[in-house]
């Protein structure tokens, strides 16, 4: 059993919960997810089965799209509503749509981001959330991220009693982006505390929300002996790579890891190629400027 399940992760489940449940349903241990979603976040979570676990890094490298909401006027320990409130600054009046749009624009493009203390980023061999739970502080490394777009839906809703303003947004960003930190940063741009209120992942690994299946769907497909209706081919993770179809002779060479010239593959030295045989993506080959040949980068199947 090999392929990618574009799973819809429900709120309340961890990403590992989904992996564990699928291992039980599918009766296989070779299951891996392609990017953690917090328990309070729902949406697209591609899960790799069998030999498809080899493409996890390629799925994770793709950009993500999220829809959610940010609440201005308070802050929590975790930067979302799961944490304890550590600051309140009631708003006397709502920010205008132009003000929040300008704040979002300042966070668009290639920027530096510091991951939250309640995250799985490791520092000196320990996860940041382990330091946080122990009441310890540690210097957090910044990372470079790209926010392709940060669209806000107007000025949102103002709660005069609570002194808060909640604004819906949609974000397209690179891997490794903490959206709850972007919510906090939006507040900083406006000079007020902020927290991410809700979040749904709309796209990941090339899969959209409309393409996902639920755990119940997978269980039903397994019971009907039709699991293939929930599986997508490995090639979904490799759609951005140039593809070259191999004949029987070239496949015999490739499956044994033989280096190939650009002429043999009829290529003008593309940096990396996805090689297919009989309609199935078998491997990735990478061009070596030093050797002037294509060399194996990752094998997915040899039969």
Curated annotation (Swiss-Prot):
EC number(s) recorded for this UniProt protein: 5.4.99.25
CDD domains (alphabetical): PseudoU_synth_EcTruB
Pfam family, one: TruB_N
Enzymatic class: isomerase
Recorded catalytic activity of this chain's protein: uridine(55) in tRNA = pseudouridine(55) in tRNA
GO biological process: mRNA pseudouridine synthesis; tRNA pseudouridine synthesis
One Gene Ontology MF term: tRNA pseudouridine(55) synthase activity
Residues annotated as the enzyme's active site: 38 (nucleophile)
Keyword set, alphabetical order: Isomerase, tRNA processing
Source organism superkingdom: Bacteria
Alphabetized InterPro entries for the sequence: PsdUridine_synth_cat_dom_sf (IPR020103), PsdUridine_synth_N (IPR002501), tRNA_psdUridine_synth_TruB (IPR014780), TruB_C (IPR032819)
PANTHER family, alphabetized: PSEUDOURIDYLATE SYNTHASE TRUB1, TRNA-PSEUDOURIDINE SYNTHASE
Family under the similarity heading: Belongs to the pseudouridine synthase TruB family. Type 1 subfamily.
Biological function: Responsible for synthesis of pseudouridine from uracil-55 in the psi GC loop of transfer RNAs.
NCBIfam families from the UniProt entry: TruB
Protein name in the entry: tRNA pseudouridine synthase B
